[in-house]
Amino acid sequence: MEFNGNLNAGSCSRSKKSHRQKQQQPQPQPQQHIEEIKYVGVRRRPWGRYAAEIRNPTTKERYWLGTFDTAEEAALAYDRAARSIRGLTARTNFVYSDMPRGSSVTSFVSPDESQRFISELFNPPSQLEATNSNNNNNNNLYSSTNNQNQNSIEFSYNGWPQEAECGYQSITSNAEHCDHELPPLPPSTCFGAELRIPETDSYWNVAHASIDTFAFELDGFVDQNSLGQSGTEGFNSLPSTFFYQ
């Protein structure tokens, strides 16, 4: 019985040791295949940043473009320098609309092109031209031509009618265009002004009316029935200047 107990204890200790050894062994980690895109004119520094430089084909000199945090920023800096130096013959990292096909290393569109596309999408040229034309039309002055005197009168578009629109002309300013004039107004008599009536056939000439034909003097009221048949006798034998025939 004791022999069996020792065997069981030894087997348990061995199993525990083997289990511990398995746990201590490092497990193989899956290999991560990260392929970085190789851009033209870009180099990675040991501390993790990216440097960009370009070589001038005519002078055989290298120009330092700077150090950037990402490879895309360094590649964009190289493209800008290459396009300015070499023009359409430059080898770029991104695709540009004005460059020939196959001139880029990658098939990615340049960030500069995407920004320009977005700006044109939200602000199309037709809309910008329409907006500018509306602003110019609102700021301009409008003109209206008078058909009679053919004088252009400039006015601001404020909704008020002008002289040319109403067609009104003063008599004094445009007397040569009128066939006839209105008669003059009579003078005002509010403040005691003397009213003179023109001497025409349609009015009575009071000045030439003779009062002598109606002149007579009456000393009193005389009844016609009390007159005698004789036209030469006076009333009650009193002298009078009134006679009848």
Curated annotation (Swiss-Prot):
> Taxonomically, what lineage is the organism?
Eukaryota, Viridiplantae, Streptophyta, Embryophyta, Tracheophyta
Q: Give the chief site where it resides.
A: nucleus
Natural source organism: Arabidopsis thaliana (Mouse-ear cress)
Coiled coil feature spans: none
Under Gene3D superfamilies, the record lists: AP2/ERF domain (3.30.730.10)
Localization of this protein: Nucleus
From start to end residue, where is composition biased (Polar residues)? Answer: 1-12
Give this protein's Gene Ontology molecular function annotations.
DNA-binding transcription factor activity; transcription cis-regulatory region binding
Q: What is this protein called?
A: Ethylene-responsive transcription factor ERF087
Q: Which Pfam families match?
A: AP2
DNA-binding region as annotated in the record: 38-95
Q: Where is this region: Disordered?
A: 1-34, 127-148
Q: Where is the composition biased (Low complexity)?
A: 23-32, 131-148
In the record, the note on similarity to other proteins reads: Belongs to the AP2/ERF transcription factor family. ERF subfamily.
Q: Name one GO cellular component term.
A: nucleus
